[in-house]
Regions:
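Short acidic-glycine-tyrosine-enriched beta hairpin
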Residues: 62-78
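Short, surface-exposed secondary-structure edge patches
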Residues: 29, 48, 64-65
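Ligand-binding loop in jelly-roll beta-barrel domains
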Residues: 78-103
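Conserved short histidine dyad/triad with adjacent acidic residue
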Residues: 28-43
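A short, N-terminal "cap"/entry segment at the start of jelly-roll beta-barrel domains
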Residues: 1-24, 40, 105-111
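Glycine- and acidic-residue-biased ligand/ion/polar-headgroup-sensing regions
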Residues: 45-56, 61
Length: 111
């Protein structure tokens, strides 16, 4: 078998899990219950968030929140402050694709 299969949690409970940490890409899986949030952080690479369930509420650089429903792919540039919340009534589930892998990027600003 030439391909590699990776698994991820199927849950409604909060989870942040690294699925792939390869030289060229980093892929994470995140589930956030209604009213909860991901810890505030700075994008440490070029980030693409693939929303598969619920609505992702995103504030960049302390701006107003934009809301991205399931079926959206949200691109976030390197080195921006990110606040990710689930402001909806449904569980939020999304995948984060970081390319290149953050290990190859320069240091990010401090928040």
């Amino acid at each position: 078998m030439l391909e590699t299969e990776y698994t991820y949690s199927r849950t409604d409970a909060f989870v942040m899990e690294k699925i792939i940490d390869a030289e060229y890409v980093n892929i994470n899986h995140i589930v956030v219950a209604p009213g909860e949030a991901v810890p505030t952080h700075v994008s440490n690479s070029w980030v693409h968030q693939i929303v598969v369930r619920g609505t992702l509420s995103l504030s960049l650089e302390d701006g107003e929140f934009n809301h991205h429903p399931a079926g959206s792919v949200v691109a976030v540039p390197f080195n921006l402050k990110m606040i990710i919340q689930n402001q909806g009534s449904e569980t939020l589930e999304f995948f984060v694709v970081k390319a290149p892998n953050p290990r190859t990027m320069s240091e990010t600003k401090k928040i």
